[in-house]
Amino acid sequence: MFRRLIGVVVATVLLTFQLIVGSATALELDEATRTVPLNAQGDTVTLSLKQVKEGKRLFQYACAQCHVGGVTKTNQNVGLEPEALALATPNRNNIEGLVDYMKNPTTYDGVEEISEIHPSIKSADIFTAMRNLTDKDLESIAGHILLQPKILGDKWGGGKIYY
């Protein structure tokens, strides 16, 4: 009887603590954090809280099976960290560049099209997770990818040493 009472008290304290403290959500991201590059010309855009939330959900749905934590499972040398995106040709460190890649992916040097081996809108018949994604969805996913280094720092794309 006493053990049950202790268990109930501990559970109540933990649940109360969780309600008081809460968890990090999109609501806690300030406008400066949510501002990401829009294009190669240097324009920026501030993501709405809805875009942040939707981008995370869509990334988990369509991309995370291969890019969990910003790492590329099939090629550990190329991830989604800002440096790798900036060095790609054309560079992919902005929303327009990432959306273009999700529509028509190319090799890191930009020479060959790889839509048959990388999920994209172009290959939605093969990679069904991409089938119903709209341009707004792709922009939300791109925003999520560009936002993660600001939230996670070096963990995003850092690989096994962080996870």
UniProtKB/Swiss-Prot annotation:
HAMAP family: PSII_Cyt550
Main localization (coarse): membrane
Entry keyword Membrane: yes
InterPro entries per UniProt: Cyt_c-like_dom, Cyt_c-like_dom_sf, Cytochrom_C550, PsbV_cyt_c550, PsbV_cyt_c550-like
PROSITE patterns: CYTC
Keywords: Electron transport, Heme, Iron, Membrane, Metal-binding, Photosynthesis, Photosystem II, Signal, Thylakoid, Transport
Organism: Trichormus variabilis (strain ATCC 29413 / PCC 7937)
UniProt: heme c binding residues: C63, C66, H67, H118
Function summary: One of the extrinsic, lumenal subunits of photosystem II (PSII). PSII is a light-driven water plastoquinone oxidoreductase, using light energy to abstract electrons from H(2)O, generating a proton gradient subsequently used for ATP formation. The extrinsic proteins stabilize the structure of photosystem II oxygen-evolving complex (OEC), the ion environment of oxygen evolution and protect the OEC against heat-induced inactivation. Low-potential cytochrome c that plays a role in the OEC of PSII.
Protein name: Photosystem II extrinsic protein V
Location relative to the cell: Cellular thylakoid membrane
Gene3D superfamilies, A to Z: Cytochrome c-like domain
Cofactor: heme c
GO MF annotation list: electron transfer activity; heme binding; iron ion binding
Any one of the GO CC terms: photosystem II
The protein's assembly and partners: PSII is composed of 1 copy each of membrane proteins PsbA, PsbB, PsbC, PsbD, PsbE, PsbF, PsbH, PsbI, PsbJ, PsbK, PsbL, PsbM, PsbT, PsbX, PsbY, PsbZ, Psb30/Ycf12, peripheral proteins PsbO, CyanoQ (PsbQ), PsbU, PsbV and a large number of cofactors. It forms dimeric complexes.
Extent of the signal sequence: 1-26
Family designation: Belongs to the cytochrome c family. PsbV subfamily.
Domain of life where this protein originates: Bacteria
Topology class, membrane: Peripheral membrane protein
Gene giving rise to this polypeptide: psbV
Record text on cofactor binding: Binds 1 heme c group covalently per subunit.
GO term, biological process aspect, one: respiratory electron transport chain
